[in-house]
């Protein structure tokens, strides 16, 4: 069952697979480095209640 216009032994499938993996990795990184810090920033309403390091802010435990 060869696809029309495919050459090189399923190179189209390999390309789609690589692109899919890259998209998944980028989505995971975006979630951890953008979404998580934003969710943590919402927890602290006042600036003096926040503690920030490495770009991620969270409510002070003390």
UniProtKB/Swiss-Prot annotation:
- Explain the post-translational modification: Not glycosylated.
For this UniProt entry, what's an example GO CC term? viral envelope
Protein origin, superkingdom: Viruses
Q: Which residues cross the membrane?
A: 16-36
The record's subcellular location field reads: Virion membrane
Briefly describe its induction. Expressed in the late phase of the viral replicative cycle.
- Write out the entry's keywords from A to Z: Disulfide bond, Late protein, Membrane, Transmembrane, Transmembrane helix, Viral envelope protein, Virion
User: Its membrane topology, per UniProt?
Assistant: Single-pass membrane protein
Indicate the quaternary assembly: Homomultimer; disulfide-linked.
Protein family per UniProt: Belongs to the asfivirus inner membrane protein p12 family.
**Protein's UniProt name:** Inner membrane protein p12
């Amino acid at each position: 069952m060869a696809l029309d216009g495919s050459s090189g032994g399923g190179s189209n499938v390999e390309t789609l697979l690589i692109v899919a993996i890259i998209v998944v990795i980028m989505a995971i990184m975006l979630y951890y480095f953008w979404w998580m810090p934003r969710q943590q920033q919402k927890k602290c309403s006042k600036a003096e209640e926040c503690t920030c390091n490495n770009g991620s802010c969270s409510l002070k435990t003390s």
